[in-house]
C-alpha cells in the first residue's frame, strides 16, 4: 500500500521546484500575486504558460532521472530480468503520469486562488490514497503492474502515456489561456 501511495503521490511532484513561495501559496496567494505582476508587463499569456511548462519539464527531467536511476540501482529484485530499454519504458510511463497530473496542478495554480489550489491538492492526495487502498485490497500493485506493462510493451506503453499526458497538458493550456483572459487577480 505505502509504495503505491508513495509513487502515486511523489512522482507527479518531481516536476515542481519547492521554495518558500510554494509552501506559503495557500496563505499569501503568491501565485496570484506573481500573475498580477506579470500581467503589468508586456508578456503574453502564451509566454506565461510556456514558461510554466518549461518550469515543469526541466525539474521533471532532472529529478526524474535521479529518482529512477537511484530506484534502478537499489530495487534490484523488482526489476530483475528487465532490459535497460524496458526500465526506461517503465520510467517514461511514470514520467507521463507525472505530466498528466501536473496538467491539473498547473491549471489550478494559474487559474484559481491559493486556497482552491490547496483544496485541489488535497483532493488529489485523497484520490491517491483511495487508489492505493483499492489496489491493496484487490492485491494489485501499481508498481508491479507498470513493471509488467513495461516488460510486455516497452515501446507502446510510454508512447500511449506520452500521448495521454501531453493531451492533458494541451487541454490544460487551452483552459488556462481562456481563464487568464477573464481572471480577476485582485
Language-model-derived ranges and their functions:
Residues 1-33, 51-186:
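Hydrophobic alpha-helical transmembrane segments of membrane proteins
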Residues 39-45:
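Short helix-to-coil transition segments within interhelical loops
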Residues 47-49:
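Alpha-helix N-cap/helix-start motif at helix boundaries, enriched for small hydrophobics
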Amino acid at each position: 500500500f505505502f509504495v503505491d501511495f508513495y509513487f502515486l503521490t511523489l512522482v507527479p511532484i518531481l516536476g515542481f521546484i519547492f521554495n518558500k513561495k510554494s509552501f506559503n501559496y495557500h496563505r499569501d496567494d503568491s501565485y496570484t500575486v506573481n500573475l498580477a505582476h506579470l500581467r503589468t508587463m508586456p508578456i503574453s499569456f502564451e509566454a506565461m504558460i510556456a514558461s510554466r511548462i518549461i518550469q515543469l519539464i526541466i525539474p521533471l527531467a532532472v529529478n526524474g532521472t535521479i529518482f529512477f536511476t537511484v530506484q534502478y540501482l537499489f530495487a534490484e529484485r523488482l526489476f530483475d530480468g528487465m532490459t535497460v530499454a524496458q526500465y526506461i519504458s517503465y520510467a517514461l510511463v511514470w514520467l507521463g503520469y507525472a505530466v498528466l497530473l501536473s496538467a491539473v496542478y498547473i491549471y489550478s495554480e494559474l487559474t484559481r486562488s491559493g486556497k482552491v489550489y490547496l483544496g485541489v491538492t488535497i483532493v488529489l492526495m485523497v484520490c491517491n490514497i483511495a487508489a492505493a487502498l483499492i489496489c491493496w485490497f484487490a492485491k494489485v500493485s501499481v508498481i508491479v503492474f507498470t513493471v509488467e506493462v513495461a516488460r510486455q510493451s516497452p515501446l507502446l506503453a510510454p508512447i500511449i502515456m506520452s500521448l495521454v499526458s501531453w493531451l492533458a497538458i494541451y487541454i490544460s493550456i487551452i483552459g488556462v489561456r481562456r481563464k487568464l483572459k477573464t481572471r480577476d487577480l485582485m
